């Protein structure tokens, strides 16, 4: 996903007018909103799959069963968990379809009234967006299986191949004049290919035979065990969405599509930079779960220092390059849209660094199957929405309001709380 965004963005900015870029950013935000209907089950499933392959025999509501390093895998528990995942995501896909066809289409029709571009292309892209979101959610657990099993390298290879296909198709179709349809259609094809490959990697002949021979634990019991923390994660993600993504949806009602486009592409590149900064952390997630099951505090300290140090280094290096070279690079490709001014960009970088530092610390807590941060996350999200309305409507702060609202909401508590909790837990300070 990181590489695809970096490679494709210049072509989008070069060939598409600002209004179309604004619609594309709205699409990206709607996709992020749809994924909230996962309710936190994907990271919870991934973490519990890691526990199962570490040898646990039961899944607990809070905490984790400690094991030795050579405990056998309980395939009966794994089989029941797989069945629970399939049932859950099947129902979620049906719900997403209903919401997008009704409320989603009504919202998009309202936005199109301000759009002077090709509305037929935009509506076709919207139909494809509905299809990709439903299919993506229906097969969402495939990523959890690979990450939980520890197939980090294979998962990355599949993503690289899928995104290479996505970029190649999208660029060709954009230059063939297909507009938004090119991007969304290419995403759909890429997602199907990635899911097929993920299935083949996890469900080997050996895995199929072991699962076939195993009894199955009741999926309802498994869902009851993991649902409390999954819902807490889901509420945390909902708060995170309100903090990080609601500005696009709310801002589009108060600002022009051109302003939304400038803010949106800046946010897109910020997301790319943040994902690069979090690569080490994402790669070590299965190891964090294993350290928790084995109560290995020394290992957790080592991973925390490595992940935090790499994240800060990438943010600083990438941020400096972006500030000095960002708009120059856009001029080089004759982009019709530019990044926000330097002062705004620097503030966004600082806010983004604090955000991902506390999110990473929360991940270390979550590896122990504890979710103490869901209420603060919801409170931060609600505060962000209130501040957005205040800054955009009565105060009319424009894009500055989009930037400052989430930063102020997070700085009040979450930015400092969770790093301090992890440091105290691991070092006793």
Predicted segments — roles?
Residues 39-73, 270-294, 367:
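Helix-loop junctions and terminal segments of transmembrane helices
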Residues 27-39, 236, 240, 244, ...:
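Transmembrane helix-bundle signature of multi-pass secondary active exporters and lipid flippases
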Residues 98-117, 317-336:
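Short membrane-interface helical motifs at transmembrane helix boundaries
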Residues 13-20, 153, 164-196, 326, ...:
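Membrane-interface helix-loop junctions in multi-pass transport and translocation proteins
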Residues 133-159, 181, 346-377:
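Membrane-interface junctions at transmembrane-helix termini in multi-pass inner-membrane proteins
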Residues 180, 184-187, 196-244, 295-298, ...:
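Interhelical loop/hinge segments that connect adjacent transmembrane helices in multipass membrane
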Residues 25, 61-91, 223, 227, ...:
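Interfacial transmembrane-helix starts/ends
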Residues 1-55, 231-258:
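Signature of the first transmembrane helix
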């Amino acid at each position: 996903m990181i590489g695809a965004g970096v490679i494709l963005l210049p072509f989008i900015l070069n060939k598409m007018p600002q209004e179309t870029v604004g619609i594309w950013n709205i699409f990206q935000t709607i996709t992020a909103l749809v994924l909230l209907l996962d309710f936190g089950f994907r990271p919870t499933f991934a973490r519990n799959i890691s526990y199962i392959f570490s040898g646990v025999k039961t899944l607990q509501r809070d905490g984790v069963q400690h094991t030795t390093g050579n405990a056998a895998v309980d395939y009966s528990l794994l089989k029941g968990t797989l069945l629970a995942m399939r049932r859950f995501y099947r129902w979620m896909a049906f719900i997403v379809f209903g919401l997008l066809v009704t409320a989603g289409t009504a919202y998009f029709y309202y936005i199109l009234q301000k759009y002077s571009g090709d509305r037929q292309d935009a509506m076709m892209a919207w139909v494809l967006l509905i299809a990709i979101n439903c299919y993506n959610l229906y097969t969402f657990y495939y990523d959890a299986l690979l990450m939980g099993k520890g197939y980090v390298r294979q998962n990355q290879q599949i993503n690289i191949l899928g995104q290479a296909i996505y970029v190649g198709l999208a660029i060709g179709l954009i230059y063939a004049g297909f507009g938004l349809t090119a991007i969304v259609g290419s995403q759909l094809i890429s997602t199907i290919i990635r899911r097929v490959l993920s299935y083949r990697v996890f469900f080997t002949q050996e895995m199929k035979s072991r699962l076939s021979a195993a009894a199955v634990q009741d999926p309802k019991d498994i869902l009851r065990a993991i649902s409390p923390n999954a819902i807490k994660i889901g509420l945390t993600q909902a708060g995170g969405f309100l903090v990080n993504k609601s500005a696009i949806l709310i801002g589009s009602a108060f600002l022009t599509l051109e302003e939304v486009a400038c803010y949106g592409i800046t946010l897109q590149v910020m997301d790319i930079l943040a994902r690069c900064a979090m690569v080490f952390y994402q790669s070590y997630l299965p190891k964090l779960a294993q350290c928790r099951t084995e109560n290995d505090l020394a290992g957790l300290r080592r991973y925390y220092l490595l992940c935090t140090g790499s994240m800060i280094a990438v943010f600083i290096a990438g941020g400096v390059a972006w500030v000095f070279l960002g708009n120059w690079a856009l001029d080089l490709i004759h982009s019709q849209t530019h990044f926000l001014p330097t002062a705004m960009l620097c503030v966004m970088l600082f806010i983004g660094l604090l955000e991902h530092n506390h999110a990473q610390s929360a991940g270390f807590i979550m590896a122990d199957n504890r979710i103490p941060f869901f209420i603060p996350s919801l409170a931060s999200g609600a505060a962000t929405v209130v501040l957005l309305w205040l800054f955009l409507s009565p105060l009319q702060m424009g894009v500055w309001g989009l930037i400052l609202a989430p930063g102020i909401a997070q700085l009040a508590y979450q930015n400092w709380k969770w790093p301090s909790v992890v440091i105290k837990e691991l070092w006793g300070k």
